[in-house]
A protein has these predicted regions:
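Asp-based, Mg2+/Mn2+-dependent phosphohydrolase catalytic module
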Residues: 2-33, 44-45, 49-175
């Protein structure tokens, strides 16, 4: 396990800190975003006014938003359909299946997309494997679902190794 495969290109406080100008400056035409604890809190499917404004801003600028989630179709569809967001379910992160599917289905090149998520073990690792840029965000809520709690245990070990070798990951207010 090469620790470098878990280091994000950027780390920001929240997905909503990714502004249109900063994404455009990086040549980003689409944001692939994890669902639970990245776009919305896993236990609050309604989203926040801040999230709704962020979606509106990106859409107005012509930046695509595609949820790439390991969840079932039912879970993802129920969470995002009210927001009109495209999605890929059963993404199988940390493998590239969902990212590859999103880029092919929505006609994006690797240089034009970024994967945003709250987990090194799934979101960031999948982005590395797919050859796209990655952005790590802090989880929206500190309490995770049972499945995610298991990943967080491994993630803490990886984070310690990253910190020992490269120093701590520093979260900023934007890219």
């Amino acid at each position: 396990m090469a620790i470098e495969n878990y280091i994000p290109d950027f780390a920001v406080e929240a997905v909503y800190d990714l502004t249109v100008p900063s994404l455009q400056a990086q040549g980003i035409k689409a944001v692939l975003v994890d669902l639970d604890n990245t776009l919305i809190a896993w236990n609050n499917p309604d989203g926040t006014p801040e999230m709704k404004q962020w979606l509106h801003d990106l859409r107005d600028a012509g930046i695509g938003i595609i949820v790439v989630s390991n969840n079932t179709k039912k879970r993802v569809q129920r969470a995002v359909e009210k927001f009109g967001i495209d999605y890929v379910y059963w993404a199988l992160k940390p493998f590239t299946f969902g990212i590859d599917r999103a880029m092919k289905e929505f006609h994006y090149d690797k240089k034009e997309v970024v994967m945003v998520g709250d987990q090194l073990m799934t979101d960031i690792r999948a982005a590395h494997r797919a050859g796209i840029r990655s952005i790590l965000v802090k989880p929206l809520v500190q309490h995770d679902s049972i499945k995610t709690q298991i990943n967080r245990t491994s993630e803490r070990r990886v984070m310690r190794k990253i910190t020992e070798k490269y120093g701590p990951i520093t979260y900023k207010k934007g890219i």
